[in-house]
Amino acid sequence: MSRIGKLPITVPKGVTVKLEGDNLLTVKGTKGTLSKKFNKDMIIKVEADQIVVQRPSDLKIYKSLHGLTRTLINNMVEGVTNGFQKTLEINGVGYRAQKQGKKLVLTLGYSHPVEMEDPEGIATEVPAPNKIIVKGIDKQVVGEVAAKIREKRLPEPYKGKGIKYETEVIRRKEGKTGGKGKK
């Protein structure tokens, strides 16, 4: 039995869960609505205040889908109640971010500012010029948007300049030491 998959998911008050044919699960909460279609073989049971995921047999594919399905449903419930957020930090001289309407404008040492439009269901905030907060109800989309922002200027190992996640630790490298004094 999957250790994660066998745990029931508690549904908080104010959240409605609806299971339709072909394992289409719709979770509605205070922050919004999420729908996702799961593998038709997985058995999803929606009870009064909890959701239980079971697998049809002990085949390897079902064992791997068991924990995955349970975690995805849990992330949907968590997203519509609390939402998800990722914080990014910008390090570097002259590197900064600012918000213009629904656009995020990044000045990252290129010859032009990098503009990024907020996708549907995602909000970006800039509380300080060197900090970006990405918020949303879908954990996967929040992570993708944060990764796309980070991709615009990856952190480099010598000076640590670039965009990094708040919790990320950049392994620093030593600069070149040889060559001084040679002619």
Swiss-Prot record:
Cystine residue pairs? none
UniProt GO cellular component terms: cytosolic large ribosomal subunit
Keywords linked to the UniProt accession: Ribonucleoprotein, Ribosomal protein, RNA-binding, rRNA-binding
The record's Gene Ontology biological-process terms are:
cytoplasmic translation
Which InterPro entries does the record match to this protein? Ribosomal_uL6-like, Ribosomal_uL6-like_a/b-dom_sf, Ribosomal_uL6_a/b-dom, Ribosomal_uL6_bac-type, Ribosomal_uL6_CS
Quick check: keyword Chloroplast in the entry? no
What does the record give under GO molecular function? rRNA binding; structural constituent of ribosome
Question: How does this chain assemble?
Answer: Part of the 50S ribosomal subunit.
| UniProt record similarity statement | Belongs to the universal ribosomal protein uL6 family.
The name on file for this protein is Large ribosomal subunit protein uL6
- This chain's source organism reads Ruminiclostridium cellulolyticum (strain ATCC 35319 / DSM 5812 / JCM 6584 / H10) (Clostridium cellulolyticum)
